[in-house]
Amino acid sequence: MAIQWPTWSAIAPTLVLGLTALLLFVVDSISPDSTNRGLLSGIATVGSLVALGITGWFLSAGTGNETITLYNGALVVDTMSLFFVLIFTSVTALVSVASYDYLRDHAYQAEYYALVVLAATGMTLMASANSLAVVFVSLELASLPSYALVAILKKNRGSVEAGLKYFLIGALSSAIFAYGISLVYGVTGSLRLPQVASALAGSGWESVSGVLGVGVLMVLGGFAFKTASVPFHFWAPEAYEGAPAPVSAFLSSASKAAGFALAFRVFVEGFPLGAAASAGIDWALLFQILAVATMVLGNFAAATQEKVKRMLAYSSIGHAGYVLIGLAALSAEASTNGDVMGAAMAHLLVYGFMNTGAFLFVAMAENWGVGRRF
């Protein structure tokens, strides 16, 4: 007889990551001055691998073939969310392993690993968010630990300065994003993406189409920050250069993929192109402009850099433009949208691992004494 698992078990990878972060905090509370990097790195790595294994099992068993809805529609688990969770957990495990030697004799190791796992927890929630409220909370859960991770090298002025700039730009983008959500809620009367889409499919939007358009534009700005897309890309070169190399790898791959997971979910499910166009909002055109600007600026700027981290940062911005093509190429006819989204997701998968490898090689060079040392 088949085992009937409870519905909440569909978010088991998220729960495992959350429990792993709590365990790291417990270890830190018992031994605040602990530098047992083997234990700390092992806990973070094992927790990430367990979450990765559960996600792979779900995908192989076809768990996401039929959408699973949890908590009254606030979260959904489907193939797309599991695909992105697979990326997040894989990158988290790689970063945790790479940090073992990189953080030798460095303080705040327990906090470092806990912040990495907490950020990954927020990213898994971002992939499953089906409500604008959950979208905002999960985005902040992923962003707040990232600010601290960038500035964790307290004795390094570049790290602290990069973390401060990242935080200030992130706070501004969060405020813009939250205000955009409030405008969308005020017009549609709902925060859940299916209800927002149903409201947009109705009629009588002429008097409030401007307010709704501004709200959608502000929401798009929040995603542009998270994915380091033009014109919200200014934080990326500073943050990637000042942060520890494993953190740069984490931000450039997992964090960027999380931003696109949210964008795919919100704009495809919450603001369907056909319904949005009938309300006078052509967000595909906005993504087309963003894609062109991001690709051009990112790649041309990368070609002029003399520092490896800044070059990789601008290259990461350029790759964000490539993925934006996936949103820019969507049409009101849904027959080809699946192929377009699949291509964008495949690019994120390959890019995520390749860019993680590039930054981890930089971490090895720094650890060997070629670059910065603690």
Cite the ranges covered by each PLM segment:
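Alpha-helical transmembrane segments of multi-pass membrane proteins predominantly involved
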Residues: 1-374
